[in-house]
Amino acid sequence: DQRETFMKTHLLTMTAGAALMASLATAEEVRVYNWSDYIDEELLTKFEEETGIDLIYDVFDSNELLETKMLAGGSGYDVVVPTGTFLQRQIQAGAFQKLDMSKLSNKDNMWDVIEKRTAQYDPGNEYSINYMWGTTGIGVNTGKVTEVLGADAPITSLDLVFNPENMEKLSSCGVHFLDAPTEMIPAALTYAGLDPDRKDDEALAAAEEVLMAVRPYIQKFHSSEYINALANGDICVAFGWSGDILQARDRAAEADNGVEVAYNAPVEGALMWFDQMAIPVDAPNPEAAHTFLNFIMDAQNMAAASNYVYYANGNAASKEFLVEDVIGDTAIYPDEATLDKLYTVTPFPPREQRSLTRMWTKVKSGT
């Protein structure tokens, strides 16, 4: 499974002499750490061909994993892609360097509507550029869910995944939840009728209650396996990221396997998140990192990425190059009414983060 493999676009095998040459020319290498299944790999080849810079590309599937590397320092990466809430905390911890705008001629392509929203995590957008944004919501195998719950199954509502009566029935065809407490807790709070950005003990207890009530019916907590599981018909519901579920829809259609996947941002409200590209403070090659960011901000390159991964991007100039399947899909580029229903959240402070981690461990173990 490509999600599980450690993906590298370039394997450097060289003699000691060549290795010495390479160490003298480190500016000619850039190391990027991005989410899995999150770019058109042809862009990686194109970058190497256009710039002559060797690109080493590794992947992860959890913000917590990335944050551990960022806060420890010495990751060896030149470009990383944290989600906004995590980025904010990492900027405050001194993990990133300010971008040199003089090296980012394509910055003008960026979309002011999105930059206004990302500024709450990165004031003035001085440390990062938006790569992709999306929502967290409900992916369903429409045929199986209808079979189990009937034609009026609440596939657009949090009731589908948080009402124990529904979940007990759905457990017969398989349900996956994201292994991402900062995504799942706001959804549980929304279902409980509370502010999704609350982080106090009372709110966490309410979220825990919602999750524990359906815990017996959750087959797995994982942040990437649900794509193939949905596409193959192995599960019938996933609470996950918009573009990942739409990728599952696309894979099922390509396989022509009779599986029909649909994505919905919950009508009660959905989390809107932003994945930002940033340069670590100790990046070995900040020069090459800027070259990579500028390449990504090219309108056609950014469009190619979105057309491949089914996520909206923060690049206004890319819109004319987006395929209709992407720009015309309100699950990817929401209409005004849906946008109004989307909420953003702030980072968890250290004490609350520890409470969250403890609670999440408890929920996952079901004890």
Question: What feature does the model see in each segment?
Answer:
Residues T5-T26:
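Gram-negative bacterial Sec-dependent N-terminal signal peptides
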Residues Q97-D108, A255-L271, P280-A283:
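Short beta-strand->loop
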Residues F86-R89, V237-G258:
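A ligand-binding cleft/hinge motif common to bilobed small-molecule-binding domains
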Residues N228, E336-T367:
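Conserved C-terminal helix/tail region of periplasmic/extracytoplasmic solute-binding proteins
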Residues E28-Q90:
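Early extracytoplasmic/lumenal segment of secretory-pathway proteins
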Residues D275, P280-K341:
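Mature extracytoplasmic/periplasmic domains
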